[in-house]
Each structure stands twice: as structure tokens, then as C-alpha cells.
Amino acid sequence: MNELSEFQALQQSLNDSDFVLKTQEQIAKDFGKFNLFFPEEFLTTALSKETIESFVSERIADLMLEGETRLLQLLYTIDLPEKEFLSLTTQPNFLAQLSQRVLYREAYKIYLRKKYS
């Protein structure tokens, strides 16, 4: 499967509430390692893409207060390439773009688990 068709399959998967909830759980798990927690509804209710990105954006902003090293450690845990992160740092909507990348990377983990299990 090529990259484009995998992206399309991932986009389609984000319409499935069970898949979205598993993605939210993965996000909460990875962020929890950095003492960044989400409200109960984040773990129990499949949210819209925009709402998830908003929650993620808030947590990233909190983590940035602790310094760039902590943020890079989180991105390493999520498996978001540093090169990709650096390309976003000059963007005016940095947090929104980074949150979107985090969501898609976490969703991709769930997609691959489902595909190969």
C-alpha cells in the first residue's frame, strides 16, 4: 500500500468512533508519561478531530513551559520525527499544526496495530 492510500485509509478510520476512542487512549497514554492528563470525557467519548486537536494543543502548550527538551522527549515518545517538528517551528499556527501531526501519528499507530493484528 502506498503512502497516499494509507493516508486515505487513516482518514477513513478517523470516522469510526471506536478507532477514534482508541486513538484518544493512545494520546492519553503517551502524554501521561509526561504528567499531562486529559479530562474523563477524553477517555470515554469519541470526540471530533478539532476537539482532540484542541485538547492536545493545550497539553503541548503546558509542556512547552517546561522547556524544549521535554517537548522533544514527548515527540520522541510519539515517534514524530524531529525534522518534521523543526519544519513547523516557523509556522504562525505552530501549535495547531503540531497538534494535528500528533493526532495523525497516534492514529497511525492504532491503524497499524489494527492492520497487522
Predicted regions and their residues:
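Hydrophobic alpha-helical segments at protein termini of multi-pass membrane proteins
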Residues: 1-14, 60, 70-73, 104, ...
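Amphipathic alpha-helical binding modules
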Residues: 83-117
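Intrinsically disordered or highly flexible coil/loop and linker segments, enriched in small
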Residues: 33-37, 69, 108-116
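Short, contiguous, helix-prone interaction/anchoring segments in small proteins
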Residues: 26-66
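Conserved phosphate/pyrophosphate-binding and hydrolysis machinery centered on Walker-type P-loop NTPases
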Residues: 13, 17, 42-49, 88-92
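Membrane topogenic helices and adjacent juxtamembrane segments
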Residues: 1-41
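Amphipathic protein-protein interaction modules
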Residues: 53-97
